């Protein structure tokens, strides 16, 4: 996390999901105590952050985080079991470090992101879902009680979340 002031407000940017998975309750409580807004930089959570600014929470039916399915999408467990580390590191859409690429290939990353979303947005676990969107263009979906769906879409790039987090342009 890094902290800055902008227009009289205090912001923290969060790029490490593991800290929120383990200490999310405490981190969020500290942010609330210090009147600090935590701004996620991860693409899925940034897309939820921007979308939830305009949605009344009581209108939410379901929230979807998207996953590309990684290099093993569509394979059986037997086929995956026989894959090499090198094959797991060959993500079809994202250029990431080794740890997150392996976490993505095994979907562990998506499990972390569900916990992260619960903490960041005070969402009940039963609202949270994962859907495979192989092109990595849809970053999150919010289904409303009236049946409509809000989608946050962009090319698979971290440029928008990073630019927002670094510049603190207010959405």
Where are these regions (language model features)?
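Single conserved hydrophobic/aromatic residue that forms the stacking wall/gate
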Residues: 1-11, 169-170
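General beta-strand structural signal in soluble alpha/beta enzymes
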Residues: 13-15, 37-42, 65, 130-132
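Short, ordered loop/turn segments at secondary-structure junctions
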Residues: 16-20, 43-46
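Rossmann-fold NAD(P)-binding glycine/threonine-rich loop
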Residues: 17-36
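Short acidic, glycine/serine/threonine-rich loops at helix termini
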Residues: 24-27, 50-54, 74-79, 140-144, ...
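Conserved anion/nucleotide-ligand pocket segment
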Residues: 51-109
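Rossmann-like dinucleotide-binding domain that binds NAD(P)(H)
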Residues: 95-137
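C-terminal substrate-binding/catalytic lobe of Rossmann-fold NAD(P)-dependent dehydrogenases
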Residues: 121-130, 134-168
């Amino acid at each position: 996390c890094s902290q800055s002031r902008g227009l009289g407000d205090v912001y923290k940017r969060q790029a490490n999901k593991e800290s929120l998975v383990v200490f999310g309750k405490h981190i969020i409580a500290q942010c609330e105590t210090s009147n600090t807004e935590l701004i996620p930089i991860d693409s899925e959570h940034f897309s939820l952050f921007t979308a939830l600014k305009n949605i009344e929470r009581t209108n939410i039916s379901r929230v979807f985080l998207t996953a590309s399915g990684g290099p093993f999408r569509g394979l059986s467990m037997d086929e995956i079991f026989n894959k090499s580390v090198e094959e797991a590191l060959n993500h079809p859409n994202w250029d990431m470090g080794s740890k997150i690429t392996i976490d993505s290939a095994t979907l562990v990353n998506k499990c972390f992101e569900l916990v992260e979303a619960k903490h960041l947005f005070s969402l009940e676990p039963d609202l949270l879902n994962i859907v495979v969107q192989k092109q990595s263009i849809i970053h999150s979906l919010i289904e409303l009680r009236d049946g409509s769906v809000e989608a946050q879409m962009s090319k698979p790039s971290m440029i928008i979340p990073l630019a927002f987090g670094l510049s603190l342009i207010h959405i």
